[in-house]
């Protein structure tokens, strides 16, 4: 009798040990799986906003916006959908330089989701005769103007730049912008694909070295985009560099190793005059100084410039000016 009880007790002990061992194995397995999941998530490629590329808005359906605006765009870093509308219809000269559309005549509109709404910003290139009709139509469609001004000097015909802002339904705003731009001669057709590896006749490798980053060929122009180091906010919403708050530096070859340069520096107030002095010390003209937005933080000033000289000499002048700014390090 006692022997049977001992046997039953030993059997129960073995069963209890087996159950505890099974629970331990399952717990360890669950911990390992959870750890692997976290490691995979953390190692996923990320965009500039720190968001995993697996969740990029490339998967987001921007087709209705494209259809409403009448032009396709592309997804940029910072979850931005950006549409370029270069004024290839315009024949603009500054002195003896025939200005290419991607040097100083590039309209653009950018969209960024904000919950159920979308923040829209843009810069529209217009002739003087187009300004009033486009402005009025934009206001009727709920699109606000935040600036209207020149970017360069002595251009012919006279060109104006209208900066816009809206916070509303993306499709509604896209249609409003389309309807306004139809009152101008802005082309909506996609431009012919350019040769992105063409020899521009200027030493782009040296330009990259001087500027401290790689530029890109776009429509016969060599372009640099240099973000600021700090976050830019508009109405408590972050504005990514691709929405017009990065320094834009453009080189258009003009022969013999020379280039016409223009673009804009994005500056806080304490940087304005040091940048002016750096540009003038290097023979680069300052052609405009103004705001582009209304409620940004920190307060920003946009300084436009012009030069037509040896491309490497001008690049050194631009580099000297950039060194006076709080720009992101590359």
In which residue ranges do the predicted regions lie?
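Intrinsically disordered, low-complexity segments enriched in glycine/proline and serine/threonine
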Residues: 6-9, 25, 49-54
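N-terminal secretory signal peptides that target proteins for export/translocation
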Residues: 1-22
């Amino acid at each position: 009798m006692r022997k049977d009880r001992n046997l039953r007790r030993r059997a129960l002990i073995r069963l209890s040990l087996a159950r505890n061992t099974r629970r331990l194995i399952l717990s360890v397995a669950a911990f390992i799986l959870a750890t692997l999941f976290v490691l995979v998530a953390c190692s996923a490629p990320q965009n500039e906003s720190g968001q995993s590329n697996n969740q990029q808005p490339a998967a987001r359906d921007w087709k209705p916006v494209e259809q409403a605006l009448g032009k396709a765009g592309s997804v940029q870093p910072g979850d931005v959908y950006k549409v370029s509308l270069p004024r290839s219809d315009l024949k603009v000269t500054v002195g003896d330089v025939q200005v290419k559309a991607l040097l100083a005549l590039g309209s653009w509109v950018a969209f960024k989701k904000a919950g159920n709404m979308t923040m829209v910003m843009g810069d529209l290139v217009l002739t003087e005769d187009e300004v009033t009709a486009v402005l009025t139509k934009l206001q009727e469609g709920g699109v606000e103007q935040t600036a209207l001004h020149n970017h360069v000097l002595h251009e012919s015909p006279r060109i104006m730049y209208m900066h816009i802002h809206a916070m509303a339904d993306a499709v509604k705003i896209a249609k409003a912008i389309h309807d306004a731009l139809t009152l101008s001669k802005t082309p909506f057709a996609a431009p012919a694909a350019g040769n992105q590896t063409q020899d521009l006749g200027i030493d782009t490798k040296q330009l990259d070295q001087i500027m401290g980053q790689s530029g890109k060929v776009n429509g016969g122009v060599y372009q640099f985009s240099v973000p600021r180091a700090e976050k830019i906010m508009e109405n408590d919403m972050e504005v990514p560099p691709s929405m017009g708050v990065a320094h834009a530096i453009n080189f258009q070859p003009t022969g013999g190793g020379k280039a016409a340069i223009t673009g804009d520096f994005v500056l806080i107030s304490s940087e304005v005059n040091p940048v002016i002095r750096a540009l003038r010390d290097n023979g680069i003209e300052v052609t405009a100084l103004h705001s582009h937005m209304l409620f940004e933080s920190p307060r920003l000033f946009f300084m436009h410039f012009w030069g037509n000289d040896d491309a490497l000499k001008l690049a050194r002048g631009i580099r000297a000016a950039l060194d006076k700014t709080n720009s992101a390090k590359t």
